[in-house]
Design a protein with these regions (language model features):
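Outer-membrane beta-barrel translocator/receptor signature
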Residues: 116-117, 129, 138-141, 152-227, ...
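Gram-negative outer-membrane beta-barrel transporters
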Residues: 388-389, 446-453, 559-561, 579-681, ...
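Structural signature of Gram-negative outer-membrane beta-barrels, strongest in the C-terminal barrel
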Residues: 247-251, 378-381, 385-387, 393-395, ...
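Acidic, small-polar-rich N-terminal luminal/periplasmic segments of exported/outer-membrane proteins
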Residues: 40-173, 187, 542
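Outer-membrane beta-barrel domain signature, strongest for Gram-negative TonB-dependent receptors
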Residues: 231, 237-388, 395-397, 552-554
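Membrane-embedded beta-barrel scaffold of Gram-negative outer-membrane proteins
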Residues: 198, 316-346, 501-517, 533-601, ...
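Conserved C-terminal beta-signal and adjacent last beta-strands/turns
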Residues: 202, 369-391, 538-540, 640-749
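Surface-exposed extracellular loop regions of Gram-negative outer-membrane beta-barrel proteins
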Residues: 266-277, 396-400, 486, 499-541, ...
Length: 749
């Protein structure tokens, strides 16, 4: 069993955890005694965590499932919101958009070619681009969050786990849904409207042979930020997504599914930052410091504060054929293309002329990328006591980067510059290439009626290189200070698990898993050997799952040993992507769904994480530190709490449904809590503990296809930041949205 220790844990946090464990232990001391007369039953949940459809009860993996109904009750409209209802998951970090950290595992995402260590899948297709974290949940059927290394079956970059998103499928029954929402952000100085429309339709084109589905989502949000330069509104969102699917089933054994997705965000402002210190580039200007007040910014850019453009297109083709008495062979092919552009106001001056002769300094960045994926997967039938899965996988990704800082002199009238259009300034550009192949297999053997052994492994062969770093527009030439030779990496990720089914309602499992992640090149900082070498993780996990007529519960205890953790480190002047030698993590997670009656349901989740860096010396950035001055040139981070790894986090959702003569009235309230979070490993930038409260009231008239809802998000108007863009001279947080209240109308047909 993993050994647990608590370093400097807060008394209240430990007390909360002990209290929660005690309560749940008491409740489950006799699981079958939970069944109550009059309590509504809980439906079985199917997942594909082991690449075949199975009951979540039978899978020896820690999984949290959010169904479409769960998302509606919690008013979750953004993929990042699921961190409030999934134990051990937090959307935060050093990216302006926030990226998932599962059990404290997250890498720095600084530029093209850097991929998050939590694998994101949409309809079975891996999503390498980090902008998928801005995905709106318009046509989602289910989200499965798999925790712990998932490399054996899900492949590359699943060190922390995998988030598997399933969207609505084509059906042979004509049906659809339209949802209209309007909300107002009332917690900032700018009352901002937020309008969205989602529509979904499916039905047959040829009965029992050909079916379609189509979903469209559009959102238009006024900015809730105040630009201190002129008092104007900033931070608007304008985006849409269209998804089309075509299902052809020429026979009972064969199915072909074609999917097309188009997404675009215009003037989508992802950066809403304020400096945390006075030792910044902005100190050159008396009126040029970013505001310290949340939801206030300062920018002399036209078109908003840090305007951003995102466009993506993807295509996927899945062909499945069932061989009678043997199994199913599936071919999955996909192609995706992304284009991301945004401008950062580096000087942030409030003066129209940037206090000449100092320049207006704006930084335009572009991240074009495309990827190709091909997988062949065979899923066997049950042969006596044995079943197995085997497959091969190919992945190719080209991730570009171009940056333009302009102008170097204050040549533009009015003090405004557009880095994209400027002909004067510092220009850099590069492309990172990744090519990966893998072969994998997993076998399940029933040792007895109650005990099942799972054994699997994945062999990975990967190559990554970068080229084309350029100065003053000289492209296609590898910079002399960069080693552009390919970095090759091979690994084998094994998995061993035992699942003991004590009864239909109670099971236990233990697993040992190893995960790996290949080298990562950063194309941003322009330094020699600017890449992080491969990282490795070994995990031991012990868990239990219990189900009954009116409850579902899971608990897991885990211990991680992390080697060569890829992270942002300091070289004494600026940040680079490198490796922290080692880290350790231990924790416990709980997930409980319980129906007290036909009218009342409770969902409680909790996670406790003890994490620390191992022995690692690192340089300290020059200049005054944001919160913790360190005059030393070199420090050892050994024993420090890892970043994006709160010790305690928990959430509670209560849903009460009243069945009235005229219809159904549903009231739902939820709260989520997170302990302190550090945003980089020198522990300079921290967000103190915070609690967020959401609520909704909905009414569905009898004999009607309409549901009307009132909702409130962040009702306490909690001011906390979820991301921090770090620099030795300018640490800038990105705050969460303020309080929002609104109304929604759903119509199903």
């Amino acid at each position: 069993m993993p050994k647990f220790h608590v370093r400097g844990a807060k008394n209240h946090s430990t007390g909360y955890l002990v209290c929660l464990i005690s309560i749940l232990a008491g409740l489950f001391s006799g699981p079958m005694a939970w069944s109550q007369a009059g309590a509504s039953s809980i439906e079985e949940v199917l997942v594909t965590a082991q690449r075949r459809s199975e009951s979540v009860q039978d899978v020896p993996i820690a999984i949290t499932v959010q169904t479409a109904e769960d998302l509606r009750k919690n008013n979750i409209i953004d993929i990042r919101d699921i961190g409030n209802v999934v134990p051990g998951l937090l959307y935060a970090g050093q990216s302006s958009i926030g990226v998932p950290a599962i059990r404290g595992i997250q890498s720095w995402l600084g530029s093209g070619g850097t991929e998050q260590p939590t694998a994101m899948y949409v309809d079975g297709v891996y999503q390498p681009n980090m902008w998928v974290n801005l995905m709106d949940l318009a046509d989602i059927e289910q989200i499965d969050v798999l925790k712990g290394p998932q490399g054996t079956l899900f492949g590359r970059n699943s060190m922390g786990g995998a988030i598997v998103i399933t969207t609505a499928k084509p059906e042979y029954e004509t049906r659809g849904k339209v949802s209209v929402k309007y909300g107002v952000y009332t917690g900032s100085d700018q009352d901002a409207g937020d309008k969205s429309i989602a529509a979904f339709a499916t039905g047959p084109l040829i009965e029992d042979v050909l079916a379609y589905s189509l979903s469209i989502y559009t959102r238009d949000m006024d900015g809730y930020l105040t630009n201190d330069r002129d008092g104007s509104r900033s931070g608007k969102h304008e985006k849409y997504t269209a998804r089309a699917k075509l299902l052809w089933e020429p026979s009972n054994n064969t199915s072909i599914l074609l999917s097309l997705v188009k997404s675009e965000a215009d003037d989508f402002e992802t950066l809403a930052t304020q400096t945390l210190n006075d030792n910044s580039i902005n100190a050159y200007y008396d009126d040029g410091r970013w505001s310290s007040e949340p939801w206030h910014v300062s920018s002399n850019l036209t078109g908003g504060t840090n305007p951003h453009f995102h466009e993506s297109e993807s295509f996927s083709l899945k062909i499945s054929h069932y061989f009678d008495g043997f199994g199913t062979l599936t071919s999955s092919t996909s192609f995706s293309e992304y284009e991301d552009e945004f401008t950062i106001d580096l000087d942030t001056g409030t003066s129209p002329t940037c206090n000449a002769p100092f320049p207006c300094i704006d930084f335009w960045q572009g991240y074009p990328s495309e990827d190709i994926q091909q997988e062949f997967l065979f899923t066997s039938d049950q042969f006596g006591k044995v079943s197995f899965i085997a497959g091969v996988y190919y992945y190719e990704n080209d991730a570009g980067y171009i940056g333009n800082v302009a102008p170097v002199l204050n040549l533009n009238s009015g003090g405004h510059s557009d880095g994209k259009e400027s002909k004067i300034g510092f220009i850099s550009g590069s492309t990172t290439y990744i090519e990966s192949q893998a072969i994998f297999a997993s076998i399940d053997y029933q040792i007895s009626d109650q005990l099942t052994l799972s054994l699997g492994g994945r062999y990975n062969d990967e190559e990554i290189y970068a080229e084309g770093l350029a100065y003053l527009g000289l492209k296609g030439v590898c910079s002399p200070n960069i080693d552009c030779s390919p970095v090759k990496h091979t690994s084998f990720d094994p998995r061993l698990a035992l699942n003991y089914e004590y009864s239909d309602a109670l099971s236990f499992y233990i697993s040992y898993t190893e995960g790996s992640k290949g080298a990562v090149m950063s194309t941003f900082t322009l330094t020699p050997n600017d890449f992080a070498g491969p990282e490795d993780l070994s995990s031991i996990e012990v868990g239990m799952k219990a189900t009954g007529d009116n409850y579902r519960m899971s608990a897991a205890i885990f211990s991680y040993d992390y080697e060569d953790f890829q992270d942002q480190v300091w070289n004494g002047t600026y940040a680079i992507l490198s490796n922290v030698k080692e880290a350790e993590m231990q924790g416990i997670e709980l997930d409980l769904l319980y129906n007290f009656s036909e009218n009342l349901q409770i969902r409680a989740v909790a996670s406790y994480l003890d994490s620390e860096y191992g022995d690692h010396l690192t340089a300290v950035p020059n200049g005054v530190m944001s919160q913790q001055p360190m005059p030393l040139a070199v420090v050892n981070v050994k024993g420090d709490q890892m970043r994006i790894a709160p010790e305690l986090s928990y959430g509670l959702t209560l849903t009460h449904t009243s069945f009235l003569p005229t219809g159904e009235l549903e009231v739902s309230a939820s709260m989520s809590y997170s302990d302190d979070v550090w945003f980089e490993y020198l522990q300079r930038v921290k967000q103190d503990a915070w609690t967020v409260v959401n609520a909704s009231v909905s009414y569905a008239p009898s004999n009607s296809d309409i549901r009307l809802s009132l909702f409130g998000r962040n009702l306490g108007n909690k001011k906390y930041f979820t991301s921090a863009l770090l620099d030795p001279t300018n640490d800038s947080p990105v705050y969460s949205p303020p309080r929002q209240v609104g109304i929604a109308l759903d119509y199903a047909f």
